[in-house]
Amino acid sequence: MSPSPFAPTIETIDYPFPPKPIPLSDAEKADYKASIKQLLIEKDAVLVAHYYTDPEIQALAEETGGCVSDSLEMARFGRDHPAKTLIVAGVKFMGETAKILSPEKTILMPTLEATCSLDLGCPIDKFSAFCDAHPDHTVVVYANTSAAVKARADWVVTSSIALEIVEHLDSEGKKIIWGPDRHLGSYIAKQTGAEMLMWQGDCIVHDEFKANALRDLKRVYPDAAILVHPESPASVVAMADAVGSTSQLIKAAQTMANERFIVATDRGIFYKMQQAAPGKTLIEAPTGGNGATCKSCAHCPWMAMNGLKAIEASLSDSDKTTHEIFVDEDLRVKALIPLTRMLDFAKTLNMKVKGNA
C-alpha cells in the first residue's frame, strides 16, 4: 500500500540511549534478591515483569508470585492481585497502563527514565494535531503509547487483536488513523486491505532487523523456522514462517515441529520461550549485515534499566518521586474508554487479549 499523502514525514530521531547498568557480582545479586523478596512482603507489593526485561528479573517475578507477560496482561494481573502496590519492571507507558486500570493502587517502577521509542516518537501535541486534521477518521493506537495518546484515541489495540479490530472498523466503512508503529500498521493494512493514515513511528529494536542478513543466516540454518514480530520491517516479515505478538511467538516455538527457530524480536523473550520449548534451539535474528553496527542489538536499552538495584530502590527509597506513576484522573478516565472498548470487543470474539510488545 502506498503511503498516504497526508501521513507525517518519517523523521530520523537520534534517541538518547541510557547508559547500561553496572554489572553486579554474584554476591551483590544474591543480596539484592533477598532484600527485594523481603521488601515485597513488607510493602504488600507484587512484581510484574515484561517479556523483554533481563532473564534474572523475569525469574524473580515468577519466584515471588508475580507474573511475566506483555504490558496489558501485566496491568490486568496487577489489577486482579490483592497486593496494594504493583512494581512494574518495564517501560513507562506500561506503568501508566497499570495505573489506568488500578487507580487505587500504588504503581512503582524501578526508574521513570525507562521509556520507549514508540512513545517518544508519538508526542501528544503533534499526534493530536494530526488527528484534528482528519476529524472524520477513527483513531486507533497501539498499546505502546502514553496515557495522553491513549486518551486521544477511539480504540487502543494490542498486536494480538489489531487485525480483528481494524477488519471490524473497515467493514463498517470507517476511515482509520493508525499510530504509532508504521511497520505494524503496514502489516495490518496489508492483511486487512484497510486504508489507514499512518503515524510514522517505529520500535528501535525491531526496526534494526535486516532482511539480507536474515537471508544469510537462514542459509546457515535451513531447517530453522523464522519467527517475526510485526513491528519489524516488511522485508523481514515477508520471510517469516510465523508472524505474531510476543505471546503468539512463544506459542509458535512451542507448537511448531521445527527444532530450531530464528527469532526476530527482543532477545529478552528467550527466557519464556525456552521455558515453553525446552528442547528447541533459539537463534537471535541479525540486526545488521556483515560489518554493520547495531544500536539496540536486539535488546531494548530502556528495558535493560530494570535491574535488581533499581527494583530494590523502588521499594526501599523513602522518596518515591523517582519511582511512582501518577496519571491525572481526567486523563485516566479518558484513556480507560478506548482500552475498555478493546476488552469488550475481545469478549465478543471470546478471545483473551495479549501480545503487545
From Swiss-Prot:
In what pathway does it function?
A: Cofactor biosynthesis; NAD(+) biosynthesis; quinolinate from iminoaspartate: step 1/1
Q: Where does iminosuccinate bind?
A: H50, S71, Y142, A143, N144, S159, H229, P230, E231, T246
Q: Which leading EC class covers this enzyme? A: transferase
The GO cellular component terms are: cytosol
EC number, as in UniProt: 2.5.1.72
Q: Is Iron given among the entry's keywords? A: yes
Per the entry, what this protein does is: Catalyzes the condensation of iminoaspartate with dihydroxyacetone phosphate to form quinolinate.
Name of the molecule in the record = Quinolinate synthase
Q: Which organism is it from?
A: Shewanella sp. (strain MR-7)
Q: What is the lineage of its organism?
A: Bacteria, Pseudomonadati, Pseudomonadota, Gammaproteobacteria, Alteromonadales
Q: Could you tell me the gene encoding this protein?
A: nadA
